[in-house]
């Protein structure tokens, strides 16, 4: 079971949930992102994100129209694997599409980049086998 904290950017309030790994993430429509998927390889029992990041995910997933597999979203800073200012530590970054073809990743990248809901969509030259999306502030 995980404690999931969601910062509501509209009300500036924190919402706290206690969820199982197989439960959908708060604000994710349907079952397009489960708590266990959001956690990825993190060993933390406390996870956090924002409703704005989840809304950006929803828009991307709806526009793409198919499942988007991912392996990495949340990380604690001491768990490593990312730079010191990684948005994964803030719970607002998603590395997606690792299991997809290059053409499918290109389509995800184009959808995410053209929607305008993400703060940053990493250039494909920097992430050749995945797509990095984040809703940084």
Predicted regions and their residues:
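Selective for proline/serine-rich intrinsically disordered segments
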Residues: 22-24, 67, 121
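Catalytic cores and adjacent binding grooves of peptidoglycan-active enzymes
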Residues: 4-9, 44, 83-94, 98-137
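N-terminal start-of-chain detector that recognizes signal peptides
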Residues: 42-43, 64-71, 103-107
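Intrinsically disordered, low-complexity segments enriched in small/polar residues
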Residues: 28, 38, 78-81, 114
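Extended, low-complexity, intrinsically disordered C-terminal regulatory tails
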Residues: 51-83
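Extracytoplasmic cell-surface/polysaccharide-interacting catalytic and binding patches
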Residues: 1-59, 136-137
């Amino acid at each position: 079971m995980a404690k999931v904290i969601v910062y509501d950017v509209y009300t500036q309030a924190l919402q706290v949930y206690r969820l199982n790994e197989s439960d959908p993430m708060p604000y994710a429509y349907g079952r397009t992102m489960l708590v266990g998927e959001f956690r990825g390889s993190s060993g933390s029992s406390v996870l956090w994100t924002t409703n704005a990041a989840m809304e950006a995910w929803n828009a991307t997933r709806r526009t793409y129209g198919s499942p988007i597999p991912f392996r990495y979203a949340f990380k604690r800073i001491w768990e490593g694997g990312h730079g010191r200012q990684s948005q994964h530590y803030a719970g607002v970054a998603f590395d997606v599409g690792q299991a997809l073809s290059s053409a499918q990743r290109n389509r995800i990248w184009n959808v995410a980049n053209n929607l305008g809901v993400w703060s940053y969509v990493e250039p494909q030259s920097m992430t050749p086998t995945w797509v990095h999306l984040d809703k940084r502030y």
